[in-house]
Amino acid sequence: MTLTKADLADLLFEQVGLNKREAKDMVEAFFEEIRMALEAGDSVKLSGFGNFELRQKSERPGRNPKTGEEIPITARRVVTFHASQKLKSKVEEAYAGAST
């Protein structure tokens, strides 16, 4: 199963009591704030969940797998996510419980 933004909005509707429009707007605003922070070059730290950070990747040589031709992969910034230890532990516990 995949958790979507629509699922998150439904959960806010059911568990918090927001109307569907408010719930959808809140989810959209949350992700928009994360996107804007990353675009501005800021890290995003969500306590107990994890960190979104920007990382600079240097130019490096690459290879076309079909032709074997060497092509440069340009330098770029990428978004990385590092799960918090708390999140990792919870997922590990849930996975360990499911396999027994």
Swiss-Prot record:
UniProt KW keywords: DNA recombination, DNA-binding, Transcription, Transcription regulation, Translation regulation
BP GO terms, sorted: DNA recombination; positive regulation of metabolic process; regulation of DNA-templated transcription; regulation of translation
Keyword Ligase: no
Any Pfam family hit: Bac_DNA_binding
Gene Ontology molecular function: DNA binding; structural constituent of chromatin
UniProt xrefs under InterPro entries: Hist_DNA-bd, Histone-like_DNA-bd_CS, IHF-like_DNA-bd_dom_sf, IHF_alpha
CDD domains in alphabetical order: IHF_A (cd13835)
Keyword check for DNA-binding: yes
SUPFAM superfamilies given in the database record: IHF-like DNA-binding proteins
Example of a GO cellular component annotation carried by this entry: cytosol
Subunit structure: Heterodimer of an alpha and a beta chain.
Family affiliation: Belongs to the bacterial histone-like protein family.
Known role: This protein is one of the two subunits of integration host factor, a specific DNA-binding protein that functions in genetic recombination as well as in transcriptional and translational control.
Protein name: Integration host factor subunit alpha
Organism: Methylobacillus flagellatus (strain ATCC 51484 / DSM 6875 / VKM B-1610 / KT)
Gene that encodes the chain: ihfA
